[in-house]
Amino acid sequence: MHEQLSPRDQELEARLVELETRLSFQEQALTELSEALADARLTGARNAELIRHLLEDLGKVRSTLFADAADEPPPPHY
């Protein structure tokens, strides 16, 4: 036999369904945010590595372009 729910029980049932629905959406949002954070961390790590390499390359270029003046031969008028 199937009993009819009282109005109070129906209200509680509706509230429970609403809360379960909200929880489901929040869990989905949390999963998406977690994935986005993981992607951002990977991107940040890659960018940090790229910057490190670029700074090394820049240092090499600077040392080539702006060599120590003591290493340069004197100008011809000396």
UniProtKB/Swiss-Prot annotation:
Against InterPro entries, the record matches this protein to:
SlyX
Classification via Pfam families: SlyX
- Residue ranges annotated as coiled coil are none
PANTHER family according to UniProt: PROTEIN SLYX
Would you identify the family this protein belongs to, as annotated? Belongs to the SlyX family.
What is this protein's record name? Protein SlyX homolog
- The organism is Xanthomonas campestris pv. campestris (strain ATCC 33913 / DSM 3586 / NCPPB 528 / LMG 568 / P 25)
Upper classification of the source organism reads: Bacteria, Pseudomonadati, Pseudomonadota, Gammaproteobacteria, Lysobacterales
